[in-house]
A protein has these predicted regions:
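Hydrophobic targeting/anchoring helices
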Residues: 10-12, 107-108, 119-231
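Active-site neighborhood of glycoside hydrolase catalytic domains
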Residues: 52-159
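Repeat-unit-sized solenoid/scaffold elements
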Residues: 17-42, 85-100, 145-179
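Short, surface-exposed linear patches
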Residues: 22-25, 98-101, 186-187, 214-218
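Short secondary-structure capping/turn micro-motifs that flank functional sites
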Residues: 7-9, 83-85, 201
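Active-site-adjacent "subsite" loops/lids of carbohydrate-active enzymes
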Residues: 5-71, 104-111, 115, 123
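Glycine-rich, histidine-containing beta strand-loop boundary motifs that form or position
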Residues: 1-5, 80-81, 142, 196
Length: 231
């Protein structure tokens, strides 16, 4: 497991690696002002997003190569938090968009550029991993999501060797999303695994547990729609 989209240490040490909005501000998962006071209400979680078009990409490549070299058996690598719909206007992205003639006022064009950056990054990782562990499975989480569907529309999931469908129905998309999502990938010939958890609102939310009946229903739905179960 490797968290691509969330690394507080790297974001603090290298602000030039962070995703930026049109005004140059760092893009975060939730609002938490830099000058917030100790007793101000805090979001459930918050982090700064990092851009694959910066030195962060090289940093990841170095770390993944170290993993591949140090461990003689690597059966797979699972990379988390790929969100192309969070458009980036950092210096590197702005410069490349200008070079490619991308209209920065065209949301669809900027989105396609973001997918292009992610695609290049993912293909480089796939090539690197295959040099050391050609049989290893590789998955980039976020590419199979049908909500906020920029990754999905541009078929970013083609860089995966298998498809995991992240599904917390009580917070993301409800219970009607899985049938459509699973059938799409099964009909395309992919093996699929559906991921859910005891959490109601987010991964790592400690506010409560789902009722056992709800978990059994989710497991039955996964099996009914042809997926492996992962809780």
């Amino acid at each position: 497991y490797y968290t691509f989209g969330w690394s507080c240490n790297d974001a603090e040490a290298h602000p030039d690696w962070c995703v930026r909005d049109r005004k140059g501000a760092i893009v975060t998962s939730d609002v938490w002002p830099e000058d917030a006071k100790a007793d101000d209400p805090k979001p459930s979680y918050q982090w700064k997003f990092l851009c694959a078009n910066t030195g962060y990409h090289d940093h990841i490549m170095e770390q993944v190569e170290e993993i591949c070299k140090r461990y003689p058996v690597v059966d797979g690598l699972w990379f988390d938090i790929y969100m192309s719909f969070r458009h980036c206007f950092c210096d590197a992205c702005t410069k490349e968009m200008e070079e490619l003639g991308v209209d920065k006022d065209d949301e669809e064009a900027v989105g396609a550029f973001n997918v292009h950056v992610m695609d290049r990054h993912q293909k480089a990782l796939r090539e690197l991993i295959s040099q050391y562990h050609p049989a290893a499975v590789v998955f980039f989480n976020g590419t199979t999501a049908i909500e906020n569907g920029l990754n999905f529309r541009h078929e970013a999931y083609e860089n995966n060797t298998m498809q995991d469908l992240e599904d917390l129905p009580t917070t993301w998309g409800g219970y009607d999303k899985l049938p459509l999502q699973s059938k799409h990938f099964l009909n395309a010939g992919w093996p699929i695994t559906v991921m859910s958890g005891k959490f109601h609102k987010a991964w790592g939310e400690f506010g409560g547990f789902k009722d056992p009946t709800a978990l059994k229903y989710e497991a039955a739905s996964m099996i009914a729609w042809g997926a492996n179960c992962n809780f």
